[in-house]
Every structure is written in C-alpha cells, then in structure tokens.
C-alpha cells in the first residue's frame, strides 16, 4: 500500500507497534505483580480487527455500555475477561456479566437494586466505583477548579459506605474490588501514587477485604520525556506496598486506551 494513495482523513494501524506496546506493559506488570490484567478501553478505538489482536495478546476488554459489551463478545473476548464499568449498563448485560465472572464495577444505585435479581443459590462478586475528587487527593495534577467526578460513589460524604452496606445486605454477593479511575491533567506518576494511597485509606477505614484494585487508565504512551509503562507500574507497586498491602494477594487491573494505540495509528 502506498501512503501517497490514501485519502484523508484516515488512521493507519501499526500492528507491530501495538503488539510491542502491549508486551512492554505486560512485562512491566509481570515484574511486580503475580496477578494482574490489562483491560483495554474499547471506547478509545473499537476497530474489530484491533480488538481481536488485543484479545489474542491476552488483554481484557474494558467496556462501558451494553453495545460495547456485545462487541467484546462478538470479537471473541470471554465474559470472564471483560471489565464492565460506567453508568450506561443495562440490566440484562449487567446481570449476565456478573453471572459469568466478569469484573463488574457498580456505578449507580439502580445497579445495587439489580443485584436482587441474581440467583440466591449462587455466589457472586462485584466491584464498586469510587468517586474521585482529584482536586483534593492530587491537586497539582488536577485542572483548576476540578472537583468530584460524575461517576461512582463519594467516600467523603458517606455515599460509598452506604452503597457498600447495601451490597453486603445481598448475602450471596461479595464486594471484590474498588475501581478508582480518573484521567488527570498531567498523567504523572504522582497521580497514581495518590490514587493508591487514597484506595488504601478507604480499605482501612471501611475494613474491606478485597480481591482486586482497578486503578483505571490515563497513562502516557511511548512519548519522549513522559513516564514509561514500567515507571507507572513501579509507582503503583511501591505505593501499595508502602501502605501495607500484600500485593501477592490482590489483583491489579489497569485500563489503558490511548497509551497503547496513539502511536500505533
């Protein structure tokens, strides 16, 4: 194919570079965590050919709607290899994902009510989205005047604890994880250091016993003078370790999107 013959606008996918990026991120995670996964953010670029490649490379699919959930299944992702986030879930796919072992992070009060539709004879796990006020936990990395996120439950005003208590009333449902995604202005290492510390503060304050922490996305890619995948992972690892978390017993989920593909296109 001659590049000069292509009509614009168009995107060109460098498959080799995409593979290289994924493998580099996985090597970084392998160097620190025995249990981890990369949940690629489908909304970043949902080209089926590329999604199939990412599935073959062992990535999970991070989806935020029933249409993305359906697309992930269509291109071959197993249901247990899906991370289901966001307030746009529908009831049918929400319950289907939980029943089949997906990582489902609750974002809304209605989703908690939907848990009552699960078969009481089986046990299930869910996560919950924490509403991050980046202006408070990492002000140097936030936009001016930035406050609470639009998503999840606030720890400061008691919403998070109330939501967790309601989940725990469902005797066959266990809270398995926390989701703490917030894209920052700087995409710095400091953001992830502060997010991890904030997560541990919540865990200790509420006495939670979790299976995973999902630290979200918002990373730089292979860009000059920017943190590398390894530096991000090392920061997450050291921050959890410093706060007394046994990282051998907890899965770490990352949700890169643009950082994997922006120089593959």
Give, region by region, the residue ranges found by the protein language model.
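Residue-level detector of conserved catalytic or cofactor/ligand-binding positions
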Residues: 258-265
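Non-cysteine beta-strand/loop elements that form the S-adenosyl-L-methionine
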Residues: 64-67, 85-88, 125-141, 173-180, ...
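Glycine-rich beta-strand-to-loop/alpha-helix junction loops that act as flexible
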Residues: 182-183, 213-223, 256-258
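Alpha-helix-loop-beta-strand connector modules within alpha/beta enzyme cores
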Residues: 235-244
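Metal-dependent enolase-superfamily TIM-barrel catalytic cores that perform enediolate-based chemistry
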Residues: 148-169, 191-199
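Flexible, glycine/proline-enriched loop segments at strand-loop-helix junctions
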Residues: 9, 99-105, 145-155, 184-190
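A charged N-terminal "starter" segment
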Residues: 1-118, 122-124, 161, 165-174, ...
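Short glycine/threonine-rich loop-to-helix capping motif typified by GTGT followed
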Residues: 186-194, 222-233, 264
